[in-house]
Amino acid sequence: MKKVILFTYVIIFLVFLSGYSVVTKNIVHNIKNNYKNNVCSMKVMHLWFKIINLFSKKYNVDKKLITAIICVESSGNTHAVSISKAIGLMQIKPFSAGREVYRFRGLLNQPSDVDLYDPKINIDIGTSYINILRNKILSGIKNSEILLYATIISYAHGASKLLKSFSYNKTLAIKKINKMKIKEFLDYIHNKYSEKKAWDYLSKVMYVYHLV
């Protein structure tokens, strides 16, 4: 019963935020499928809660967001590897997100594949990357909700790609985003953004986020 109530709440939440013209039958159908197929088992996710809490506090990142991203990215499988060579719980690409985190830490090179199969290292780097996206790369975005959505999209598809869809000038891109209301930003992601998978990814993450 509790799950049904939560599921209903999430649907209403997404409809409210996105506007009835934005949340199509297909999107709602996808969310229902996520609910029906149980995106990931909380019994599996429970294995990582202690580590999630540790790095949530270290990087000041919402533990619900970390949990949701792990759930959507890997279903809590430490051995998950994508076609694009993303590795582990938070599906870190060593040559992109991994290297970016190393750069901000003043380190050379990138994490090894072996490192990224380690749950603690993987969640450390993944959560650090979320922090970098939110507090460094996207820091000029004023609305906290839009910043959350932009961070989630950037985690999966890159901040540079998102910002360049508004302008190749980062300052101008952020100014354009800051002129948008929440519904306008979500409508842009759903209907105009060139990365068509971004909306589906955002929907999945927010779905789990509100169930955790």
Curated annotation (Swiss-Prot):
Catalytic activity: Exolytic cleavage of the (1->4)-beta-glycosidic linkage between N-acetylmuramic acid (MurNAc) and N-acetylglucosamine (GlcNAc) residues in peptidoglycan, from either the reducing or the non-reducing ends of the peptidoglycan chains, with concomitant formation of a 1,6-anhydrobond in the MurNAc residue
Catalytic class of the enzyme: lyase
Top-rank taxon, per record: Bacteria
Keyword list, A-Z: Cell wall biogenesis/degradation, Lyase
InterPro entries: Lysozyme-like_dom_sf, Transglycosylase_SLT_dom_1
One annotated GO biological process: cell wall organization
GO function terms (MF aspect): lyase activity
SUPFAM superfamilies, per database record: Lysozyme-like
EC number: 4.2.2.n1
Family membership noted in the UniProt record: Belongs to the transglycosylase Slt family.
Role description: Murein-degrading enzyme. May play a role in recycling of muropeptides during cell elongation and/or cell division.
Protein name, as recorded: Membrane-bound lytic murein transglycosylase E
Gene: mltE
